[in-house]
Structure formats: structure tokens, C-alpha cells
Amino acid sequence: MTPGIIVGKPYDLPFEEHFKGGRLDNSMWFIEEKGSEESTFSLMQGFSADGDGGCAGYVSASAKDAALLGSGKISLKGAANSTLVFSTKSTLADANGKVVVYIRKPDLSEKQLCVVDYSKLDNSAKDWRTTTVTYLLNILLCLT
């Protein structure tokens, strides 16, 4: 999932990233491109789900392209009900892309938490979708 091993102190909870104004709130983010060089993540201004004027956006040059956006380590120490909330949007009414959320555990194993599959959603309104992923005592809930 990551292009190497991330070292250093993890972020503590609560952890938030809003990309406010098209800028980073937290310094440790990485991108791994898995397609053509024309496809990329970028920080965008004036486009946001929460009204703060920014987001991280992915623009694909090909339907086969993919990329990974990852954060630094986040400590879940002491968290009983870990929750991840994120918003996605496709500007295509007939979108077929996927947003797949993974975590990497301290033992380096990976766990898929959630998939937002636009090919299975009605995207005719092209609105923002907010997804909440909650991990409760080994029960995983994904609500879109």
C-alpha cells in the first residue's frame, strides 16, 4: 500500500484533514501513481464538500488508471470506536471509478475497510457523497 515504510511518531486522535483552501493541514501525505503520467492527485481550491474551499482531487486520463493517496501513521491507541469520515465526488454522471479505503496495521498486514463503487451508484446529480466507516469491536460498518 505504501511506497516504503513510514517512520516517526504517529498522529494522535482526533486526526482531521480538510485540505482547506487547497492546502495540507497535516504534512505527511504521499501519492503513488498506478497509470499514465497524465493522471494525478492534486490539491484543488474552490471545490469542497465541507465549504472550506479545498480538496484533494484525482483526475484520471484513462479508465484504467489508478492512484494511491496515503497519510502518515495514525495511532488508534485508546480508541474504542474508530471512525473515518470522508467525502467523494465524481463529475461524470456515468462514472465507473472506485474509491477503496485500506489501512496498514503495525504488523504491515493490510485490511480493506470500504469501497465506494460509482458503477453501482446513481451519480446523475454528481453530488458529494459522505461515507462513514466505523470499526466497533471488530465489527466493520461502511455507510455511504
Please report, for each region that a protein language model flagged, where it lies by residue.
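N-terminal pre-domain segments of enzymes
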Residues: 1-12
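Extracellular glycan-recognition surfaces and repeat-rich motifs
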Residues: 10-63
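Solvent-exposed strand-loop boundary residues in beta-sheet-rich modules
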Residues: 35, 105-109
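Extended, low-complexity, turn-rich repeat/linker tracts enriched in Gly/Pro/Ser/Thr and Asp/Glu
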Residues: 76-80, 89-97
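Short, conserved beta-strand segments of beta-strand-rich sandwich/propeller modules, principally
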Residues: 83, 142-144
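Beta-strand signatures of extracellular beta-sandwich domains
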Residues: 100-102
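Extracellular carbohydrate recognition and processing domains
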Residues: 109-141
